[in-house]
């Protein structure tokens, strides 16, 4: 067992214990998060429009903040996109994640410095919970494929724009960088078919132990792997 796998087991147990403490008091845990979010956003335009200063309970929130879709929030989003501050969240976001827009065109989701860690930690913690439950940590010594959109970002009004998976690529922990595949150059390829073939070419003879990404992407890469011969 390697030092890395031993460390992974120790860290996994720590994260599991933290999650268990939250799970044992779910209402209290969620209410603390609720209060923190309301307090942080009460001076924003959205917070003022919806009387966040008066919201003390979940019932207050239901009365003041109606359920709505993206189009109903688009006016706020457009203000943030051109650099206005304190609209949906304090200050302005560091990123905008652009979705494919399957229903009504592209959608832009703001990502703040407070929210970015949750995107990384959620994936990390899923793996750590698996390690804690099974005791299997040997896979951390193998290569790991992260199927992502292009990490190349554009910038407007001090905010960077890109695909969510491409944005998250900038936040892969240092301790995973050595095991990470494909290469940065391959991740930057826009054409999907070319990208898949390049990924397979880079990884087919490696000891791959983890693959992550949108299920359809994982399926495509896995199928392509199966159709190509490996080196003897």
Cite the ranges covered by each PLM segment.
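A short, hydrophobic C-terminal helix/tail in secreted or cell-surface proteins
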Residues: 227-232
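Active-site phosphate/ATP/adenylate-binding loop shared across adenylate-forming ligases
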Residues: 1-29, 34-51, 55-226
């Amino acid at each position: 067992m390697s030092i890395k796998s031993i460390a992974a087991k120790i860290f996994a147990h720590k994260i599991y214990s933290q999650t268990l403490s939250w799970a044992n008091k779910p209402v209290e845990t969620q209410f603390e998060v609720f209060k923190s979010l309301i307090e942080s956003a009460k001076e924003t335009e959205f917070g003022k429009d919806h009387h966040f200063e008066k919201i003390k309970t979940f019932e207050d929130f239901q009365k003041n903040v109606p359920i709505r879709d993206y189009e109903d929030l688009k006016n706020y989003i457009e203000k943030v996109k051109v650099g206005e501050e304190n609209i949906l969240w304090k200050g302005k976001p560091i990123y905008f994640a652009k979705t494919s827009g399957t229903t009504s065109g592209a959608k832009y989701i703001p990502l703040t410095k407070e929210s970015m860690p949750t995107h990384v930690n959620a994936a990390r913690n899923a793996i750590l919970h698996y390690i804690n439950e099974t005791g299997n940590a040997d896979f951390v010594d193998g290569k790991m494929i992260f199927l992502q959109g292009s990490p190349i970002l554009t910038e407007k009004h001090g905010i960077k724009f890109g695909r969510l998976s491409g944005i998250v690529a900038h936040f892969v922990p240092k301790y995973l960088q050595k095991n990470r595949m494909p290469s940065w150059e391959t991740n930057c390829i826009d054409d999907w078919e070319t990208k898949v073939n390049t990924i397979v070419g880079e990884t087919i003879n490696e000891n791959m132990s983890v693959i992550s990404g949108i299920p359809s992407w994982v399926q495509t890469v896995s199928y392509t792997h199966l159709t190509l011969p490996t080196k003897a």
